[in-house]
């Protein structure tokens, strides 16, 4: 069994459902410390939702001119996994790593314990071959990416920023591939902006609408306009901004009562062609134009970020091409990731991991043939970046 596969299985065996790290970070710190990494726990959050965070950095020896040339690459990931769902529906126990049909089954197999294992082993191999690199290497790992994401990477980045920590390149190990490891990387993500709209009316008997004011009826024209609005056209890197309703709650449960209010949850996934402030202003303008009596609260989940083709993208593309022969596709589609926090202090952030077809599903799995190539791609990327750090 390869070291990468073995470490992946060891991580899967830890039932690390958000926010419980279940010992994953201790296991990883024990692997990293002998390599010269300074491992620092930056745990955060209340006692009833305590989040485990690990910042682990290996600083290259430097003197004179080398000090100015050295750069830092960070691998970012999460040890937490989503709940298993009904265990009886799994073909094998979700936290017992199981081989079947050329795949490794277990919760977290593809999202994202295989990526973490691949990077750790890639670092081990890189340092064995290059014991005195010009490159600083760091890992940022959290047990709260699948949950609220409040006390995880976000908190660590705030602390690193306060210290003046310099990050040059970041690889997030999210499962970005589609059919084969390396066929797609994410070089950016859309922003996410959520709103909760409460439209107020007057409750009354459904047989006497003249004595009431139905907030559902009042809200529908405004919601129809919002759903039909073209917010922007997108650009070469991002699809157009989208607006979607996720929940509508109104009524008392009785069929003969006009409700006094209706609550609508909605979300923007927005490109760099729009801003959170601009979208908020446009929504308020529509609601005001329709004369609604309403309250609206906003939650900004993350700003969009984009890494244009440059040092990091090219290094990863070269590594993928050398390992697999693939010409990888750059994409910004999909949901958010912790890359949105890291991009605040790191100018180049990409995401690369195994295929994502089974993530969050019953019988989550990763193909065995996708694990070792991922490690090799990470290893080749480290070689490329180390050459750039000393250039």
From Swiss-Prot:
Binding, Zn(2+) 1: 78, 111, 174
Pathway: Amino-acid biosynthesis; L-lysine biosynthesis via DAP pathway; LL-2,6-diaminopimelate from (S)-tetrahydrodipicolinate (succinylase route): step 3/3
SUPFAM superfamilies: Bacterial exopeptidase dimerisation domain, Zn-dependent exopeptidases
Active site: 80, 145
Binding, Zn(2+) 2: 111, 146, 360
Keywords per UniProt: Amino-acid biosynthesis, Cobalt, Diaminopimelate biosynthesis, Hydrolase, Lysine biosynthesis, Metal-binding, Zinc
EC category name: hydrolase
Catalytic activity: N-succinyl-(2S,6S)-2,6-diaminopimelate + H2O = (2S,6S)-2,6-diaminopimelate + succinate
InterPro entries per the UniProt record, alphabetical: ArgE/DapE_CS (IPR001261), Bact_exopeptidase_dim_dom (IPR036264), DapE_proteobac (IPR005941), Peptidase_M20 (IPR002933), Peptidase_M20_dimer (IPR011650), Peptidase_M20A (IPR050072)
Subunit architecture: Homodimer.
Name of the molecule in the record: Succinyl-diaminopimelate desuccinylase
The gene coding this protein: dapE
């Amino acid at each position: 069994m390869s070291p990468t596969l073995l470490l992946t299985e060891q991580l899967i065996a830890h039932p690390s459902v958000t926010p419980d790290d279940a010992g994953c970070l201790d296991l990883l710190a024990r692997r990293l410390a002998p390599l010269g990494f300074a491992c620092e726990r930056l745990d955060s959050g209340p006692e009833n939702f305590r989040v485990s965070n690990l910042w682990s950095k290996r600083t290259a020896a430097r003197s004179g001119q080398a000090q100015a040339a050295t750069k830092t690459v960070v691998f970012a990931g999460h040890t937490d996994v989503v709940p298993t769902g009904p265990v009886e529906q799994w073909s094998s126990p979700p936290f017992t790593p199981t081989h079947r049909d050329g795949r490794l089954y277990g919760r977290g197999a593809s999202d994202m314990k295989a990526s973490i294992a691949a990077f750790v082993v890639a670092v081990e191999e890189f340092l064995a071959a290059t014991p005195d690199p010009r490159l600083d290497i760091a890992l940022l790992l959290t047990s709260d990416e699948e949950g609220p994401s409040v006390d995880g990477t976000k908190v660590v980045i705030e602390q690193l920023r306060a210290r003046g920590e310099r990050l040059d390149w970041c690889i997030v190990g999210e499962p970005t591939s589609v059919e084969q490891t390396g066929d797609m990387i994410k070089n950016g993500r859309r922003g996410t902006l959520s709103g909760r709209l409460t439209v107020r009316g007057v409750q009354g008997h459904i047989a006497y609408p003249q004595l009431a004011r139905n907030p559902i009826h009042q809200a529908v024209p405004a919601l129809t306009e919002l759903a039909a609005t073209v917010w922007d056209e997108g650009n070469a890197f991002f699809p157009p901004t989208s607006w979607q309703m996720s929940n509508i709650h109104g009524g008392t449960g009785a069929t003969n009562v006009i409700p006094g209010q209706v609550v609508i949850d909605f979300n923007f996934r927005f490109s760099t062609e729009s801003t959170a402030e601009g979208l908020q202003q446009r929504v308020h303008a529509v609601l005001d134009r329709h004369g609604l009596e309403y309250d609206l609260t906003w939650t900004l989940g993350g700003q969009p970020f984009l890494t244009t083709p440059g040092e990091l993208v090219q290094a990863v593309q070269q590594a993928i091409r050398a390992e697999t022969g693939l010409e990888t596709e750059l994409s910004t589609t999909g949901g958010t990731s912790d890359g949105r926090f890291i991009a605040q202090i790191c100018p180049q952030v990409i995401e690369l991991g195994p295929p994502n077809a089974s993530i969050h599903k019953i019988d989550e799995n990763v193909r065995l043939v996708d694990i070792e190539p991922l490690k090799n791609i990470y290893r080749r990327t480290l070689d490329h970046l180390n050459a750039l750090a000393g250039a």
